[in-house]
């Protein structure tokens, strides 16, 4: 019965819906008519455009009629009407000169309705790179008699004519020719008034009078574009306007109705009550008369009709009640069904009155396409709606979830079966929960027997790890036994919970009870017992700890390594003290020993002095060291220890006899230089000490002060030094080479400056002899003493050293105030070397000559470098040994320059540049000739 009633009520509801829709539609149309009727105005504009396009199509023919009031006659018409019997070629030539446009060519197959680009660019032809039309049809006309052209030019003809298709003209346009044409046309028109009563239709229009009505030529395609723009901006045309409409002449795709037709269609929709709102009919020509064409292209914003309609129309609730009483009874019996949005209160179903609910509700975007809620709910009865069934999982929203009764009963049964349990907390709070494991979706997990066994093992491990008996628990055993019984009586059940506050079942309950009782007894005793205030004596750990304050166990190997390191460190400290005390007078005997950082003595075995004797020189004046006490850390050391130098990987370096000899010689040199500075403390604390073979040597240096002060004041250290101002040992081979070089240098100086002879005195020769003897004693390994050494060198070398030392002494006497004495630069001749002058008559491309020049140049540069180095080092060594590291270094280039002194004003002149300062590569073309050599060729 319900289905029959529903089928019978459906056509009634459809008719009611259509009537309601028609009423609402008429209301919206009336409101739109009250707001100046914008859509009708746009329709009038379209109708005016259609009429103008039809007029333009009628007037667009090849023969254009002239204005009735004008007396203008075209030259072309006069020529054709009153033509004398002349040859046709002359007529075509005149027509080509006066009646054609050179720049404008009109296509024959150009469509009559072409409208793009719009308006003022419509008659402009856009040049593209497409294939041009083959002008073979014009070739015969253009090439008949090109010599017969008159050379006249006119302005561009904007009007089309059939003569322009067959005429050619120049590209230049002139205003004078235009005025000539005007005069000619007026002359012929004045003379033709009497002869021809009816003027001949002209086909030539002047540019000033042409295209005045071009704005009215709106074609059908432009109207279509305007319609598309209106549709895009939100305007819609009513379907009733286009129903049963006959196409007029000139319209191709659609027609726009007039105002009378629109009013008739509105009367059908509005009824007799809405007829008074129809506006007066107006002629579209009068409407568009004062509107310029440029304003038609301005974008127009769509009217805000929907908002006004929403404000005026009130909300109306639609009650979807069935028409039969049976349906009313069934709807009363059923529960109230409402549509519930997520996390929002329920809302009744309201009617969509022109978008009111769409704008008011926040979820309107989902209901845009719904025209009417009644249309959607027509196929469903109100009593057939059922609430949605929710799943068992938890929901994130605040909506109510309907749970079936079966699940509620099952949950109640499980709660009744599980007994309530209490946990003995401090607050004694009890809570009843279901004991089981659950997933996140509130589903139970089945626990197998293997999982139970693993859980029991894990609980045992946790309990064994938590319970550790300490000293405090042993002291409180009596109190624990008294309180344990009380706690066990009070506790009934123990319950653990997970992170999500879910209960966890316990397997071994007795062990957990015991553990909790012990923990609580410890807390109670900690608060009440007086033993808490007393400090319990626990053994303190003295040693190293980690970052987490954990003790680091120290093994025996680590102790042995630390003992070795402390012994080496203490030996270095004692060596430094002994080295400092050697150079100072010590009246009182002091005890020297090895101590650790905590001032504990270190035991010295029998092997230690023998190894230390290779590196340490002990002064005889120092008192005997006292016997140190035994250190408990080093008492177990029985392994031999290595004292000496080690590599980066802590490997021992064996010291040979040659190294010991070199160390002894170096120590003697450093001690001799230190004695010159008024017996100040040694500046070389890091110098290794000599072997026990040279003990007598160092002792003699300390005991014989008076003997050495005389010699040290007269002698000075001669040699090279390192960057740390330490002397470098000079071997005999180097001395021989230096002697030969000095002899060559002195011979060169004697040849260049022969006017000033060299005078050698006796005193500096004796000093030089002593210095050479001392230097020779340094190199001889067989000699043990430093002072009493006899020279066995070549006398020639000695003479060279004497001369060099005399030059330094004389320089110091001449310039006592200068810290660095000046060295005179020897004069050289301005002539080029003989080996270089050979290139004048040979080609620069000769390979043999190139090789010889390069070899000679390198040799000269090396010799000049040696002279510069020797002069700077000898001069600076006389002044002070510390200035050696800051001495000027020669340049490392292959192009040598002359050694000049910057302190002299003559040498510092920028403009002065002699040929002797130039190498064969750097010589300028003004001063000397170029040899044609460059570094890029070899």
Curated annotation (Swiss-Prot):
Q: Which GO terms describe its biological process?
A: cell division; DNA synthesis involved in double-strand break repair via homologous recombination; meiotic DNA repair synthesis involved in reciprocal meiotic recombination; meiotic recombination checkpoint signaling; regulation of DNA-templated transcription; response to camptothecin
From the UniProt record, list the BRCA2 repeat ranges.
537-571, 638-672, 713-747
Output compositional bias ranges, type Polar residues.
870-879
Spans annotated as Disordered:
320-359, 409-434, 870-938
Compartment annotation: Nucleus
Keyword Ubl conjugation included in the entry's annotation: no
- Put simply, this protein is called Breast cancer type 2 susceptibility protein homolog
Annotated Basic residues bias: 926-938
A Gene Ontology cellular component where this protein is annotated is: nucleus
The species this protein was found in: Drosophila sechellia (Fruit fly)
Give the protein's function: Involved in and required for double-strand break repair by meiotic and mitotic homologous recombination. During meiosis, has a dual role in the repair of meiotic double-stranded breaks and the efficient activation of the meiotic recombination checkpoint.
Compositional bias, Basic and acidic residues, is annotated for: 320-339, 409-425, 898-915
UniProt keywords (A-Z) are: Cell cycle, Cell division, DNA damage, DNA repair, Meiosis, Mitosis, Nucleus, Repeat
Subunit-structure text? Interacts with Rad9 and spn-A/Rad51.
């Amino acid at each position: 019965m319900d289905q029959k009633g529903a089928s019978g009520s459906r056509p009634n509801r459809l008719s009611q819906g259509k009537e309601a829709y028609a009423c609402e539609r008429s209301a919206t149309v009336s409101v739109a008519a009250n707001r100046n009727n914008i859509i009708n105005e746009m329709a009038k504009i379209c109708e005016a455009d259609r009429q103008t396009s039809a007029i333009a199509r009628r007037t667009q023919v090849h023969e254009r009629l002239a204005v009735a009031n004008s007396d203008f006659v075209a030259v072309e018409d006069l020529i054709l009407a009153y033509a004398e019997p002349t040859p046709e070629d002359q007529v075509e030539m005149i027509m080509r000169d006066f009646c054609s446009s050179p720049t404008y060519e009109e296509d024959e197959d150009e469509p009559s309705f072409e409208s793009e680009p719009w308006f003022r660019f419509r008659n402009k032809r856009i040049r593209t790179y497409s294939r041009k039309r083959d002008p073979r049809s014009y070739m015969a006309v253009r090439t008949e008699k090109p010599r017969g052209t008159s050379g006249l030019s006119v302005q561009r003809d904007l009007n089309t004519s059939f003569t322009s298709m067959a005429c050619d003209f120049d590209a230049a346009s002139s205003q004078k020719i235009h005025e000539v044409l005007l005069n000619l046309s007026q002359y012929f028109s004045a003379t033709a008034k009497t002869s021809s009563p009816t003027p001949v239709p002209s086909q030539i229009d002047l540019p000033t009078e042409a295209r005045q009505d071009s704005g009215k030529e709106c074609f059908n395609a432009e109207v279509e574009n305007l319609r598309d723009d209106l549709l895009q901006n939100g305007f819609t045309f009513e379907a009733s306007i286009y129903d049963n409409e006959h196409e007029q002449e000139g319209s191709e795709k659609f027609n726009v109705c007039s105002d009378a037709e629109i009013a008739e269609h509105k009367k059908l929709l509005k009824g007799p009550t809405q007829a008074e709102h129809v506006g007066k009919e107006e002629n579209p020509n009068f409407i568009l008369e004062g509107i310029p064409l440029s304003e038609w292209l301005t974008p127009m914003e769509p009217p805000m009709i929907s908002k006004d309609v929403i404000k005026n129309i009130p909300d109306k609730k639609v009650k979807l009640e069935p028409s039969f009483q049976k349906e009313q009874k069934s709807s009363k019996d059923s529960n109230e069904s409402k549509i519930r949005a997520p996390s929002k209160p329920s809302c009744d179903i309201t009617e969509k009155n022109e978008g009111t609910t769409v704008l008011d509700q926040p979820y309107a975007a989902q209901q845009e396409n719904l025209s009417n809620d009644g249309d959607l709910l027509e196929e469903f009865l109100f009593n057939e709606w059922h609430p949605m069934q929710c799943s068992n999982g938890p929901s994130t929203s605040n909506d109510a979830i309907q749970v079936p009764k079966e699940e509620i009963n099952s949950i109640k049964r499980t709660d009744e079966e599980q007994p309530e349990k209490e946990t003995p907390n401090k607050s004694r709070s009890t809570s009843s929960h279901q004991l089981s494991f659950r997933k996140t979706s509130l589903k139970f997990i089945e626990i197998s027997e293997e999982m139970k066994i693993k859980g029991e093992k894990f609980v045992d491990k946790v309990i064994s790890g938590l319970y550790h008996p300490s000293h405090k628990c042993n002291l409180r055993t009596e109190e624990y036994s008294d309180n344990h019984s009380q706690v066990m009586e009070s506790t009934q059940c123990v319950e653990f919970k997970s992170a999500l506050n879910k209960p966890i079942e316990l397997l071994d309950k007795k062990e957990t009870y015991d553990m909790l009782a012990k923990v609580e007894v410890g807390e109670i005793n900690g608060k009440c017992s007086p033993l808490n205030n007393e400090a319990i004596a626990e053994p303190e750990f003295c040693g190293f700890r980690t970052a987490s304050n954990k003790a680091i166990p120290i093994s025996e190997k680590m102790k042995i390594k630390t003992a070795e390191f402390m012994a080496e460190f203490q030996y270095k400290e004692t060596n430094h003290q002994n080295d400092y005390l050697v150079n100072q007078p010590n009246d009182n005997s002091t005890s020297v020993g090895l101590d650790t950082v905590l001032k504990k003595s270190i035991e010295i075995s029998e092997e230690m002095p023998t190894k230390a004797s290779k590196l340490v020189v002990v002064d005889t004046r120092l008192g005997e060291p006292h016997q140190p006490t035994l250190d408990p850390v080093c008492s177990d050391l029985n392994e031999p220890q290595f004292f000496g130098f080690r590599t980066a990987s802590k490997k021992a370096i064996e010291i040979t006899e040659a190294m010991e000899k070199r160390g002894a010689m170096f120590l003697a040199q450093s001690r001799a230089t230190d004695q010159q500075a008024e017996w100040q403390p040694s500046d070389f604390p890091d110098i290794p000490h000599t072997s026990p073979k040279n003990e007598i040597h160092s002792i003699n240096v300390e005991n014989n002060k008076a003997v050495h002060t005389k010699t040290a004041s007269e002698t000075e250290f001669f040699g090279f030094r390192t960057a740390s101002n330490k002397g470098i040992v000079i071997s005999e081979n180097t001395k021989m080479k230096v002697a030969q070089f000095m002899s060559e240098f002195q011979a060169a100086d004697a040849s260049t400056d022969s006017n000033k002879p060299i005078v050698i005195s006796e005193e500096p020769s004796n000093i030089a002899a002593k210095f050479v003897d001392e230097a020779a004693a340094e190199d001889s390994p067989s000699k043990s003493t430093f002072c009493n050494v006899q020279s066995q060198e070549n006398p020639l070398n000695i003479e060279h050293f004497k001369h060099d030392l005399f030059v330094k002494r004389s320089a110091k006497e001449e310039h006592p105030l200068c810290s660095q004495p000046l060295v005179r630069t020897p004069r050289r001749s301005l002539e080029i070397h003989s080996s270089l002058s050979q290139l004048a008559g040979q080609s620069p491309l000769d390979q043999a000559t190139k090789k010889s020049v390069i070899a000679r140049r390198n040799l000269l540069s090396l010799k000049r470098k040696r002279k510069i180095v020797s002069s700077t080092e000898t001069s600076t060594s006389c002044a002070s040994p510390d200035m050696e590291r800051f001495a000027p270094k020669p340049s490392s280039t292959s192009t040598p320059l002359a050694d000049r002194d910057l302190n002299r004003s003559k040498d510092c002149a920028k403009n002065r540049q002699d040929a002797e300062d130039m190498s064969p590569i750097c010589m300028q073309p003004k001063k000397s000739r170029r040899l044609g050599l460059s570094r890029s060729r070899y």
